[in-house]
């Protein structure tokens, strides 16, 4: 298992639309395991394969405090959503940035699990928000896309400055 490098905005690879997984095999399972290692190392609650430069429809999530409730969504499809909610979201690909994003309060998704078996899941609250956030990544959408152009530009400038500081520190 390995910790993968997380892409950071404004890296254009974050905008690539992920392709469906054709077959859940040992390679896909290894990607899933590496994604969990990466997510836990980065102290996140969700990670889409796009964020680690793997452009396949794979999401890993664990919103539990104990970090023991792993959820794998391969080729997820949103089949129902209802209600309105929103929280200040953050993202491993957009460090040190949070913003309020409107989301559905409840969702129902269909996906494949780590073994390739189809399942459906109903989720609400934080899990529903996390699923929607990660599914956005699979189509090249970031949570800052919900913000005004001015706020997005400020975030871009802040992150470019941070990247320059980090590269000088190395």
Curated annotation (Swiss-Prot):
Cited HAMAP family: Pep_deformylase (MF_00163)
Q: Which Gene3D superfamilies match?
A: Peptide deformylase
Q: Name one GO molecular function term.
A: metal ion binding
The EC number on file is: 3.5.1.88
Which Pfam family is one of this chain's hits?
Pep_deformylase
Task: Tell me which species this is from.
Answer: Pectobacterium carotovorum subsp. carotovorum (strain PC1)
Task: Please state which protein family the record places this protein in.
Answer: Belongs to the polypeptide deformylase family.
Needed co-factor(s): Fe(2+)
User: Could you tell me what this protein is called?
Assistant: Peptide deformylase
UniProt keywords (A-Z) are: Hydrolase, Iron, Metal-binding, Protein biosynthesis
Which BP terms from GO are recorded?
A: co-translational protein modification; translation
- What biological function has been recorded for the protein in this entry? Removes the formyl group from the N-terminal Met of newly synthesized proteins. Requires at least a dipeptide for an efficient rate of reaction. N-terminal L-methionine is a prerequisite for activity but the enzyme has broad specificity at other positions.
- SUPFAM superfamilies associated with the record: Peptide deformylase
